[in-house]
Amino acid sequence: MTEKYILAIDEGTTSTRSIIFNHDGQKVADAQREFPQYFPEPGWVEHNANEIWNAVLSTIANAFIKSGIQPNQIAGIGITNQRETTVIWDKATGLPIYNAVVWQSRQTNDIAEKLKTDGYEDLIHKKTGLIVDAYFSATKIRWILDQVPGAQERAEKGELLFGTIDTWITWKLTGGATHVTDYTNASRTMIFNIHDLDWDDDILKLLNIPRAMLPDVRPNSEVYGETASYHFYGSSVPISGMAGDQQAALFGQLALQPGMVKNTYGTGSFIVMNTGEKPTMSENNLLTTIGYSINGKVNYALEGSVFVAGSAIQWLRDSMQLVEKSSDSEAAAKASTSLNEVYVVPAFTGLGAPYWDAEARGSILGITRGTNRQDIIKATLQSLAYQTRDVVQTMQKDTGIDIKMLRVDGGAANNNYLMQFQADILNSAIEKAANLETTAMGAAFLAGLAVGFWQDTDELAQIFSVGQRFEPNMPEEEREDLYAGWQQAIEATKIFKHRPYKMNE
Protein backbone atom coordinates (compact mmCIF):
# COMPACT_ATOMS: atom_id res chain seq x y z
CA MET A 1 0.00 0.00 0.00
CA THR A 2 1.27 3.48 -0.88
CA GLU A 3 2.34 5.44 2.20
CA LYS A 4 0.19 8.46 3.00
CA TYR A 5 1.13 11.87 4.42
CA ILE A 6 -0.44 15.11 5.66
CA LEU A 7 0.36 18.48 4.08
CA ALA A 8 0.28 21.58 6.31
CA ILE A 9 0.17 25.04 4.74
CA ASP A 10 1.49 27.58 7.26
CA GLU A 11 0.72 31.04 5.88
CA GLY A 12 2.47 33.73 7.94
CA THR A 13 2.83 37.50 7.82
CA THR A 14 6.06 37.55 5.82
CA SER A 15 6.28 34.08 4.28
CA THR A 16 4.37 30.93 3.38
CA ARG A 17 5.53 27.40 4.19
CA SER A 18 4.31 24.01 3.04
CA ILE A 19 5.32 21.10 5.26
CA ILE A 20 4.75 17.38 4.70
CA PHE A 21 4.39 15.19 7.82
CA ASN A 22 4.44 11.41 8.08
CA HIS A 23 2.31 9.25 10.38
CA ASP A 24 4.85 9.59 13.20
CA GLY A 25 4.46 13.37 13.10
CA GLN A 26 7.93 13.83 11.64
CA LYS A 27 8.65 16.52 9.07
CA VAL A 28 9.50 14.84 5.76
CA ALA A 29 10.00 18.01 3.71
CA ASP A 30 9.24 21.68 3.80
CA ALA A 31 9.50 24.67 1.50
CA GLN A 32 9.29 28.36 2.26
CA ARG A 33 8.74 31.47 0.17
CA GLU A 34 8.73 35.05 1.36
CA PHE A 35 6.40 37.65 -0.09
CA PRO A 36 6.45 41.44 0.25
CA GLN A 37 4.55 43.70 2.58
CA TYR A 38 3.40 47.07 1.28
CA PHE A 39 3.29 50.29 3.28
CA PRO A 40 1.28 52.83 1.21
CA GLU A 41 1.21 55.30 4.11
CA PRO A 42 2.71 55.41 7.62
CA GLY A 43 1.03 52.78 9.80
CA TRP A 44 -0.58 50.99 6.84
CA VAL A 45 0.40 47.37 6.14
CA GLU A 46 -0.92 45.49 3.11
CA HIS A 47 -0.29 42.30 1.10
CA ASN A 48 -1.09 41.41 -2.48
CA ALA A 49 -3.38 38.39 -1.95
CA ASN A 50 -2.33 36.89 -5.30
CA GLU A 51 1.31 36.94 -4.19
CA ILE A 52 0.25 34.90 -1.16
CA TRP A 53 -1.59 32.47 -3.46
CA ASN A 54 1.48 32.16 -5.70
CA ALA A 55 3.61 31.45 -2.61
CA VAL A 56 1.19 28.68 -1.60
CA LEU A 57 1.41 27.03 -5.03
CA SER A 58 5.19 27.29 -5.29
CA THR A 59 5.87 25.95 -1.78
CA ILE A 60 3.52 22.99 -2.35
CA ALA A 61 5.40 22.19 -5.57
CA ASN A 62 8.81 22.53 -3.90
CA ALA A 63 7.79 20.31 -0.98
CA PHE A 64 6.80 17.59 -3.46
CA ILE A 65 10.05 18.02 -5.41
CA LYS A 66 12.21 17.85 -2.27
CA SER A 67 10.45 14.80 -0.85
CA GLY A 68 9.69 12.80 -3.98
CA ILE A 69 6.18 12.31 -2.58
CA GLN A 70 3.34 12.30 -5.11
CA PRO A 71 0.28 14.57 -4.71
CA ASN A 72 -2.03 11.53 -4.53
CA GLN A 73 -0.13 10.37 -1.42
CA ILE A 74 -1.50 13.32 0.57
CA ALA A 75 -4.36 12.11 2.78
CA GLY A 76 -5.44 15.59 3.84
CA ILE A 77 -4.41 19.24 3.89
CA GLY A 78 -4.35 21.45 7.00
CA ILE A 79 -4.23 25.24 6.75
CA THR A 80 -2.99 27.60 9.46
CA ASN A 81 -2.64 31.31 8.93
CA GLN A 82 -1.95 34.82 10.13
CA ARG A 83 -5.24 35.86 11.66
CA GLU A 84 -7.42 38.96 11.10
CA THR A 85 -5.82 39.89 7.74
CA THR A 86 -8.70 40.72 5.38
CA VAL A 87 -9.26 39.97 1.67
CA ILE A 88 -12.30 40.94 -0.42
CA TRP A 89 -12.52 39.52 -3.94
CA ASP A 90 -14.79 39.28 -6.97
CA LYS A 91 -16.80 36.05 -6.82
CA ALA A 92 -16.88 35.70 -10.62
CA THR A 93 -13.23 36.37 -11.46
CA GLY A 94 -11.44 35.56 -8.19
CA LEU A 95 -9.61 38.89 -8.37
CA PRO A 96 -9.20 40.88 -5.13
CA ILE A 97 -10.77 44.34 -5.31
CA TYR A 98 -8.06 45.78 -3.03
CA ASN A 99 -4.88 44.62 -1.33
CA ALA A 100 -5.22 42.41 1.75
CA VAL A 101 -5.27 44.67 4.83
CA VAL A 102 -2.90 43.06 7.35
CA TRP A 103 -3.60 42.50 11.06
CA GLN A 104 -0.80 44.92 11.99
CA SER A 105 -2.24 47.76 9.92
CA ARG A 106 -3.63 50.84 11.66
CA GLN A 107 -5.31 52.37 8.58
CA THR A 108 -8.77 51.57 9.97
CA ASN A 109 -8.12 53.13 13.38
CA ASP A 110 -10.66 55.93 12.83
CA ILE A 111 -13.46 53.38 12.38
CA ALA A 112 -12.47 51.61 15.60
CA GLU A 113 -12.27 54.90 17.50
CA LYS A 114 -15.75 55.91 16.30
CA LEU A 115 -17.17 52.60 17.59
CA LYS A 116 -15.65 53.45 20.97
CA THR A 117 -16.88 57.04 21.09
CA ASP A 118 -20.36 55.88 20.01
CA GLY A 119 -20.41 53.57 23.05
CA TYR A 120 -20.29 50.13 21.42
CA GLU A 121 -17.26 48.68 23.27
CA ASP A 122 -19.28 46.75 25.84
CA LEU A 123 -21.72 45.30 23.29
CA ILE A 124 -18.90 44.14 21.01
CA HIS A 125 -16.87 42.71 23.90
CA LYS A 126 -19.82 40.71 25.25
CA LYS A 127 -20.68 39.25 21.85
CA THR A 128 -17.22 38.67 20.36
CA GLY A 129 -14.92 38.45 23.40
CA LEU A 130 -12.65 41.06 21.79
CA ILE A 131 -11.73 44.63 22.55
CA VAL A 132 -12.62 47.22 19.89
CA ASP A 133 -9.46 47.68 17.86
CA ALA A 134 -8.26 48.11 14.27
CA TYR A 135 -6.32 44.84 14.83
CA PHE A 136 -9.44 42.79 13.99
CA SER A 137 -11.13 42.20 10.62
CA ALA A 138 -14.41 44.11 11.06
CA THR A 139 -13.00 47.61 10.58
CA LYS A 140 -10.88 46.38 7.67
CA ILE A 141 -13.96 45.06 5.82
CA ARG A 142 -15.77 48.36 6.36
CA TRP A 143 -12.73 50.34 5.19
CA ILE A 144 -12.33 48.38 1.92
CA LEU A 145 -16.06 48.64 1.16
CA ASP A 146 -15.78 52.41 1.68
CA GLN A 147 -12.52 52.74 -0.25
CA VAL A 148 -13.45 50.92 -3.47
CA PRO A 149 -16.18 52.63 -5.55
CA GLY A 150 -19.32 50.50 -5.89
CA ALA A 151 -18.05 47.81 -3.49
CA GLN A 152 -20.90 48.18 -0.97
CA GLU A 153 -23.58 47.67 -3.62
CA ARG A 154 -21.73 44.73 -5.18
CA ALA A 155 -21.29 43.10 -1.76
CA GLU A 156 -25.02 43.44 -1.07
CA LYS A 157 -25.77 41.71 -4.40
CA GLY A 158 -23.50 38.79 -3.46
CA GLU A 159 -20.92 39.64 -6.13
CA LEU A 160 -18.06 40.08 -3.62
CA LEU A 161 -16.68 37.65 -1.06
CA PHE A 162 -14.83 38.31 2.20
CA GLY A 163 -12.32 36.01 3.80
CA THR A 164 -9.43 35.85 6.18
CA ILE A 165 -6.37 34.16 4.67
CA ASP A 166 -7.58 30.61 5.43
CA THR A 167 -10.76 31.33 3.47
CA TRP A 168 -8.86 32.85 0.55
CA ILE A 169 -6.47 29.88 0.24
CA THR A 170 -9.29 27.32 0.51
CA TRP A 171 -11.42 29.15 -2.07
CA LYS A 172 -8.47 29.24 -4.48
CA LEU A 173 -7.39 25.61 -3.88
CA THR A 174 -10.94 24.36 -4.47
CA GLY A 175 -11.29 26.39 -7.67
CA GLY A 176 -13.91 28.65 -6.09
CA ALA A 177 -16.10 25.76 -4.92
CA THR A 178 -15.72 26.31 -1.16
CA HIS A 179 -16.21 29.61 0.70
CA VAL A 180 -15.58 28.66 4.32
CA THR A 181 -13.73 29.67 7.48
CA ASP A 182 -13.31 27.99 10.84
CA TYR A 183 -14.40 28.99 14.35
CA THR A 184 -10.94 30.20 15.41
CA ASN A 185 -10.43 32.56 12.49
CA ALA A 186 -14.04 33.76 12.65
CA SER A 187 -13.58 34.55 16.34
CA ARG A 188 -10.92 37.14 15.38
CA THR A 189 -13.09 39.14 12.99
CA MET A 190 -15.04 41.17 15.61
CA ILE A 191 -18.30 40.30 13.79
CA PHE A 192 -18.64 36.69 15.05
CA ASN A 193 -20.75 35.85 18.10
CA ILE A 194 -18.65 33.35 20.05
CA HIS A 195 -21.68 32.21 22.10
CA ASP A 196 -24.07 31.56 19.19
CA LEU A 197 -21.25 30.43 16.85
CA ASP A 198 -22.60 32.58 14.04
CA TRP A 199 -22.06 35.96 12.44
CA ASP A 200 -23.68 38.58 14.66
CA ASP A 201 -26.53 40.45 12.96
CA ASP A 202 -26.38 43.39 15.38
CA ILE A 203 -22.71 44.07 14.66
CA LEU A 204 -23.16 43.47 10.92
CA LYS A 205 -25.97 46.05 10.93
CA LEU A 206 -23.87 48.46 12.99
CA LEU A 207 -21.03 48.32 10.44
CA ASN A 208 -23.31 47.84 7.40
CA ILE A 209 -21.49 44.64 6.37
CA PRO A 210 -23.66 42.44 4.09
CA ARG A 211 -24.04 38.86 5.32
CA ALA A 212 -24.03 37.72 1.67
CA MET A 213 -20.27 38.26 1.44
CA LEU A 214 -19.39 36.18 4.52
CA PRO A 215 -18.13 32.57 4.46
CA ASP A 216 -19.74 29.58 6.17
CA VAL A 217 -18.20 28.97 9.60
CA ARG A 218 -17.26 25.41 10.53
CA PRO A 219 -15.34 23.45 13.20
CA ASN A 220 -11.58 22.98 12.91
CA SER A 221 -11.40 19.36 11.84
CA GLU A 222 -13.66 18.25 9.00
CA VAL A 223 -13.55 17.96 5.22
CA TYR A 224 -14.34 21.44 3.87
CA GLY A 225 -13.81 20.62 0.21
CA GLU A 226 -11.31 19.09 -2.19
CA THR A 227 -8.51 20.58 -4.22
CA ALA A 228 -9.37 21.33 -7.83
CA SER A 229 -7.28 18.78 -9.73
CA TYR A 230 -5.74 21.49 -11.92
CA HIS A 231 -4.30 23.16 -8.79
CA PHE A 232 -2.98 19.92 -7.28
CA TYR A 233 -1.28 18.08 -10.13
CA GLY A 234 -4.26 15.97 -11.14
CA SER A 235 -5.30 14.99 -7.61
CA SER A 236 -8.42 15.89 -5.62
CA VAL A 237 -7.28 15.93 -2.00
CA PRO A 238 -9.48 16.83 1.00
CA ILE A 239 -8.82 20.11 2.80
CA SER A 240 -9.65 18.83 6.26
CA GLY A 241 -8.11 21.05 8.95
CA MET A 242 -8.07 24.78 9.54
CA ALA A 243 -7.06 27.07 12.43
CA GLY A 244 -5.56 30.48 13.08
CA ASP A 245 -1.85 30.31 13.87
CA GLN A 246 -1.99 30.72 17.65
CA GLN A 247 -4.87 28.29 18.06
CA ALA A 248 -3.08 25.81 15.81
CA ALA A 249 -0.06 26.07 18.13
CA LEU A 250 -2.34 25.42 21.14
CA PHE A 251 -3.62 22.26 19.45
CA GLY A 252 -0.14 21.30 18.24
CA GLN A 253 1.05 21.50 21.86
CA LEU A 254 -1.89 19.23 22.78
CA ALA A 255 -2.96 21.76 25.43
CA LEU A 256 -6.38 20.10 25.38
CA GLN A 257 -7.36 20.29 29.06
CA PRO A 258 -8.86 23.39 30.70
CA GLY A 259 -6.13 25.36 32.45
CA MET A 260 -3.37 24.30 30.06
CA VAL A 261 -1.40 27.24 28.65
CA LYS A 262 1.04 27.65 25.78
CA ASN A 263 3.34 30.53 24.88
CA THR A 264 4.72 31.00 21.38
CA TYR A 265 7.83 33.20 21.46
CA GLY A 266 7.81 34.68 17.98
CA THR A 267 8.27 38.31 16.96
CA GLY A 268 5.82 38.91 19.79
CA SER A 269 4.60 36.46 22.42
CA PHE A 270 1.15 34.92 22.24
CA ILE A 271 0.02 33.28 25.46
CA VAL A 272 -3.14 31.19 25.05
CA MET A 273 -5.02 29.34 27.80
CA ASN A 274 -7.57 26.59 27.23
CA THR A 275 -10.59 27.56 29.35
CA GLY A 276 -12.85 24.63 28.44
CA GLU A 277 -16.34 24.51 26.97
CA LYS A 278 -17.62 27.79 28.44
CA PRO A 279 -16.13 31.18 27.50
CA THR A 280 -14.42 33.15 30.25
CA MET A 281 -15.01 36.85 29.64
CA SER A 282 -11.89 38.68 30.77
CA GLU A 283 -12.27 41.63 33.10
CA ASN A 284 -8.58 42.44 32.77
CA ASN A 285 -7.96 43.24 29.09
CA LEU A 286 -7.34 39.74 27.77
CA LEU A 287 -9.12 38.48 24.65
CA THR A 288 -11.75 35.76 24.87
CA THR A 289 -11.52 33.62 21.77
CA ILE A 290 -12.21 30.12 20.44
CA GLY A 291 -9.36 27.66 21.00
CA TYR A 292 -10.57 24.84 18.73
CA SER A 293 -13.61 22.74 17.91
CA ILE A 294 -13.45 18.99 17.30
CA ASN A 295 -15.90 16.11 17.79
CA GLY A 296 -18.87 18.45 18.08
CA LYS A 297 -17.44 20.38 21.04
CA VAL A 298 -16.04 23.90 21.22
CA ASN A 299 -13.16 24.77 23.55
CA TYR A 300 -12.70 28.43 24.39
CA ALA A 301 -9.50 30.24 25.25
CA LEU A 302 -8.09 33.39 26.81
CA GLU A 303 -5.31 35.11 24.89
CA GLY A 304 -2.77 37.73 25.82
CA SER A 305 -0.65 39.30 23.09
CA VAL A 306 2.79 40.73 23.93
CA PHE A 307 3.96 42.97 21.09
CA VAL A 308 7.73 42.54 21.50
CA ALA A 309 9.48 39.26 22.32
CA GLY A 310 11.86 37.78 19.73
CA SER A 311 12.08 41.20 18.10
CA ALA A 312 13.76 42.48 21.29
CA ILE A 313 16.59 40.02 20.65
CA GLN A 314 16.74 41.20 17.03
CA TRP A 315 17.02 44.75 18.40
CA LEU A 316 20.03 43.69 20.48
CA ARG A 317 21.61 42.23 17.34
CA ASP A 318 20.68 44.68 14.58
CA SER A 319 20.12 48.09 16.16
CA MET A 320 22.29 47.95 19.28
CA GLN A 321 24.85 45.51 17.82
CA LEU A 322 25.39 43.99 21.26
CA VAL A 323 25.39 40.44 19.85
CA GLU A 324 26.50 39.11 16.49
CA LYS A 325 23.91 36.32 16.38
CA SER A 326 20.66 36.04 18.32
CA SER A 327 21.88 32.77 19.82
CA ASP A 328 24.84 34.62 21.40
CA SER A 329 22.43 36.26 23.84
CA GLU A 330 22.28 33.13 26.02
CA ALA A 331 26.03 33.02 26.74
CA ALA A 332 26.10 36.80 27.30
CA ALA A 333 23.25 36.61 29.82
CA LYS A 334 24.96 33.78 31.69
CA ALA A 335 28.20 35.82 31.79
CA SER A 336 26.47 38.79 33.46
CA THR A 337 27.40 39.25 37.12
CA SER A 338 24.71 41.86 37.86
CA LEU A 339 22.17 41.30 40.61
CA ASN A 340 19.30 41.69 38.12
CA GLU A 341 18.96 45.34 39.05
CA VAL A 342 18.71 46.43 35.40
CA TYR A 343 15.30 46.34 33.68
CA VAL A 344 14.62 46.68 29.96
CA VAL A 345 11.00 47.40 29.01
CA PRO A 346 10.85 46.75 25.23
CA ALA A 347 7.76 48.86 24.52
CA PHE A 348 9.00 49.68 21.01
CA THR A 349 5.44 49.78 19.64
CA GLY A 350 3.60 50.35 22.91
CA LEU A 351 2.60 47.79 25.53
CA GLY A 352 0.25 44.90 24.72
CA ALA A 353 -1.73 42.76 27.16
CA PRO A 354 -2.68 43.42 29.86
CA TYR A 355 -1.75 47.13 29.65
CA TRP A 356 -2.82 48.08 26.10
CA ASP A 357 -0.87 51.34 26.17
CA ALA A 358 -0.16 52.31 22.56
CA GLU A 359 1.67 55.48 23.62
CA ALA A 360 4.30 53.80 25.83
CA ARG A 361 7.88 53.62 24.54
CA GLY A 362 10.83 51.46 25.55
CA SER A 363 13.10 52.14 28.50
CA ILE A 364 16.18 50.89 30.33
CA LEU A 365 16.13 51.43 34.09
CA GLY A 366 18.43 50.71 37.02
CA ILE A 367 21.74 51.25 35.21
CA THR A 368 24.87 52.29 37.09
CA ARG A 369 28.46 53.08 36.07
CA GLY A 370 29.17 49.37 36.32
CA THR A 371 26.39 48.26 33.95
CA ASN A 372 27.83 46.48 30.92
CA ARG A 373 26.80 44.83 27.64
CA GLN A 374 25.99 41.47 29.25
CA ASP A 375 23.73 43.12 31.82
CA ILE A 376 21.66 44.84 29.12
CA ILE A 377 21.39 41.58 27.15
CA LYS A 378 20.33 39.67 30.25
CA ALA A 379 17.72 42.28 31.18
CA THR A 380 16.31 42.17 27.64
CA LEU A 381 15.88 38.39 27.81
CA GLN A 382 14.33 38.70 31.24
CA SER A 383 11.77 41.18 29.86
CA LEU A 384 10.25 38.37 27.78
CA ALA A 385 9.72 36.34 30.94
CA TYR A 386 8.34 39.27 32.94
CA GLN A 387 5.84 40.10 30.18
CA THR A 388 4.75 36.46 30.10
CA ARG A 389 4.16 36.56 33.86
CA ASP A 390 2.06 39.71 33.41
CA VAL A 391 -0.28 37.78 31.12
CA VAL A 392 -0.24 34.45 33.01
CA GLN A 393 -0.99 36.24 36.29
CA THR A 394 -3.89 38.03 34.59
CA MET A 395 -5.21 34.69 33.30
CA GLN A 396 -5.10 33.32 36.84
CA LYS A 397 -7.04 36.39 38.05
CA ASP A 398 -9.71 35.93 35.34
CA THR A 399 -10.16 32.18 35.79
CA GLY A 400 -9.14 31.37 39.36
CA ILE A 401 -6.98 28.56 37.93
CA ASP A 402 -3.47 28.15 39.36
CA ILE A 403 -1.17 27.63 36.36
CA LYS A 404 1.48 25.07 37.29
CA MET A 405 2.97 24.46 33.85
CA LEU A 406 3.54 26.43 30.64
CA ARG A 407 4.17 24.75 27.28
CA VAL A 408 6.44 26.77 25.01
CA ASP A 409 7.48 26.93 21.37
CA GLY A 410 8.89 29.46 18.92
CA GLY A 411 12.46 30.60 18.25
CA ALA A 412 13.28 32.09 21.67
CA ALA A 413 12.25 28.81 23.34
CA ASN A 414 15.68 27.54 22.26
CA ASN A 415 17.31 29.95 24.75
CA ASN A 416 17.88 27.86 27.87
CA TYR A 417 18.77 30.87 30.03
CA LEU A 418 15.43 32.48 29.17
CA MET A 419 13.48 29.26 29.74
CA GLN A 420 15.02 28.74 33.19
CA PHE A 421 14.36 32.37 34.16
CA GLN A 422 10.80 31.99 32.84
CA ALA A 423 10.27 28.98 35.13
CA ASP A 424 11.77 30.88 38.07
CA ILE A 425 9.78 34.10 37.65
CA LEU A 426 6.49 32.19 37.09
CA ASN A 427 7.20 29.58 39.76
CA SER A 428 5.87 27.11 37.19
CA ALA A 429 7.42 24.30 35.19
CA ILE A 430 8.24 25.04 31.55
CA GLU A 431 7.84 22.29 28.96
CA LYS A 432 9.48 22.85 25.59
CA ALA A 433 8.09 20.76 22.75
CA ALA A 434 10.61 18.39 21.15
CA ASN A 435 9.25 19.53 17.78
CA LEU A 436 9.01 23.32 17.77
CA GLU A 437 6.91 23.22 14.55
CA THR A 438 3.82 23.27 16.74
CA THR A 439 1.77 25.66 14.57
CA ALA A 440 2.10 23.55 11.41
CA MET A 441 1.81 20.40 13.53
CA GLY A 442 -1.51 21.63 14.93
CA ALA A 443 -2.89 22.17 11.42
CA ALA A 444 -1.63 18.71 10.42
CA PHE A 445 -3.20 17.08 13.50
CA LEU A 446 -6.58 18.71 12.78
CA ALA A 447 -6.46 17.63 9.12
CA GLY A 448 -5.33 14.10 9.94
CA LEU A 449 -8.06 13.51 12.52
CA ALA A 450 -10.78 14.46 10.02
CA VAL A 451 -9.68 11.88 7.44
CA GLY A 452 -8.78 9.07 9.85
CA PHE A 453 -5.02 9.44 9.31
CA TRP A 454 -4.88 9.59 13.10
CA GLN A 455 -7.76 8.07 15.05
CA ASP A 456 -8.06 10.36 18.06
CA THR A 457 -6.20 12.69 20.41
CA ASP A 458 -4.92 9.70 22.38
CA GLU A 459 -2.98 8.64 19.29
CA LEU A 460 -1.68 12.21 18.90
CA ALA A 461 -0.44 12.08 22.50
CA GLN A 462 1.80 9.16 21.48
CA ILE A 463 3.40 11.40 18.84
CA PHE A 464 3.82 14.56 20.93
CA SER A 465 6.87 14.63 23.17
CA VAL A 466 8.44 17.16 25.50
CA GLY A 467 11.99 18.02 24.52
CA GLN A 468 13.10 19.70 27.73
CA ARG A 469 11.56 20.59 31.08
CA PHE A 470 12.66 23.47 33.27
CA GLU A 471 11.74 23.50 36.96
CA PRO A 472 11.63 26.68 39.08
CA ASN A 473 14.42 26.92 41.64
CA MET A 474 14.39 30.59 42.70
CA PRO A 475 13.54 31.49 46.32
CA GLU A 476 10.13 33.14 46.63
CA GLU A 477 11.46 36.34 48.23
CA GLU A 478 13.91 36.87 45.37
CA ARG A 479 11.26 36.11 42.73
CA GLU A 480 8.73 38.55 44.17
CA ASP A 481 11.37 41.25 44.69
CA LEU A 482 12.44 40.99 41.04
CA TYR A 483 8.85 41.13 39.81
CA ALA A 484 8.11 44.15 42.03
CA GLY A 485 11.02 45.88 40.28
CA TRP A 486 9.51 44.99 36.89
CA GLN A 487 6.16 46.46 37.92
CA GLN A 488 7.91 49.69 38.94
CA ALA A 489 9.71 49.73 35.58
CA ILE A 490 6.37 49.36 33.75
CA GLU A 491 4.84 52.24 35.70
CA ALA A 492 7.86 54.46 35.02
CA THR A 493 7.68 53.60 31.32
CA LYS A 494 3.98 54.45 31.13
CA ILE A 495 4.59 57.86 32.71
CA PHE A 496 7.16 58.91 30.10
CA LYS A 497 5.19 60.35 27.17
CA HIS A 498 7.60 62.97 25.86
CA ARG A 499 8.12 63.00 22.09
CA PRO A 500 10.78 64.80 20.02
CA TYR A 501 9.89 68.41 19.23
CA LYS A 502 9.72 67.87 15.45
CA MET A 503 7.05 65.18 15.82
CA ASN A 504 4.78 67.68 17.56
CA GLU A 505 5.04 70.46 14.98
Curated annotation (Swiss-Prot):
CDD domains reported for this sequence: FGGY_EcGK_like
GO term, biological process aspect, one: glycerol-3-phosphate metabolic process
Regulation of this protein's activity per its record: Activated by phosphorylation and inhibited by fructose 1,6-bisphosphate (FBP).
Source organism superkingdom: Bacteria
Residues that hold ADP according to the record: T13, R17, T267, G310, G411, N415
First and last residue of the signal peptide: none
Disulfide bond annotation, renumbered to this chain: none
Modification sites for Phosphohistidine: H231
Protein purpose: Key enzyme in the regulation of glycerol uptake and metabolism. Catalyzes the phosphorylation of glycerol to yield sn-glycerol 3-phosphate.
Protein name: Glycerol kinase
Organism per entry: Latilactobacillus sakei subsp. sakei (strain 23K) (Lactobacillus sakei subsp. sakei)
Gene transcribed to yield this protein: glpK
